Design a protein with these regions (language model features):
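Compositionally biased, charged N-terminal/linker segments
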Residues: 1-40, 134
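Short, acidic Gly/Pro/Ser/Thr-rich loop/turn segments
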Residues: 8-10, 90, 125-127
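Loop/turn positions that initiate beta-strands
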Residues: 43-44
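Hydrophobic beta-strand signal
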Residues: 47-48, 62
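Short, charged beta-turn/beta-strand-edge "cap" motif at the junction between a beta-strand
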Residues: 49-55
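Aromatic- and Lys/Arg-enriched surface recognition patch
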Residues: 58-118
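Charged phosphate-binding loop/patch that engages nucleotide di/tri-phosphates or the phosphate backbone
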Residues: 117-134
Length: 134
């Protein structure tokens, strides 16, 4: 998985400070992104992507609680998951670097740039880990 957050709203540093308890990944109001949240399982790992400022993958988080009603959504239609910080990448991976890699050209990060929560296939996960020097 890959989850996007604007670093001035929620950054990897704030996620790290949340500790093992983790923090809710809430506020998602796109139906496709919400569907992706519903598909996440406890233990799934997700790349943490800083959007708008930086535009780069900066770390990895882990799902600690599967989807539940997002308390910030008064309609009760959208869900959240809880994630905890696992690690920062040794080398952040910029969107430009990802776009240059032919084997990653199919990613929703490139094809659906407005999507905030998206799946990452295992081959792409390995490539991105290598690019991030993990």
């Amino acid at each position: 998985w890959l989850m996007k957050s604007e670093p001035d709203v929620w950054s990897i540093d704030q996620q790290k400070k949340a500790g093992n308890k983790g923090a809710p990944w809430d506020g998602v109001r796109n139906y496709q992104a919400a569907k992706n949240l519903r598909s996440m399982k406890k233990g799934d790992q997700c790349f943490f992507y800083h959007s708008n400022i930086g535009k780069e993958i900066v770390g990895i988080v882990e799902v600690t609680k599967e989807h539940y009603i997002d308390k910030t959504d008064q309609s009760g239609r959208f869900v959240a998951v809880t994630v905890k910080f696992l690690r920062e990448l040794d080398k952040p991976i910029s969107l430009e670097e990802i776009k240059k890699h032919k084997e990653l050209s199919h990613l929703s990060l490139i094809k659906q740039s407005r999507l905030s929560v998206m799946p990452i296939d295992s081959k792409s996960w390995k490539i991105l880990n290598k690019m991030g020097k993990i």
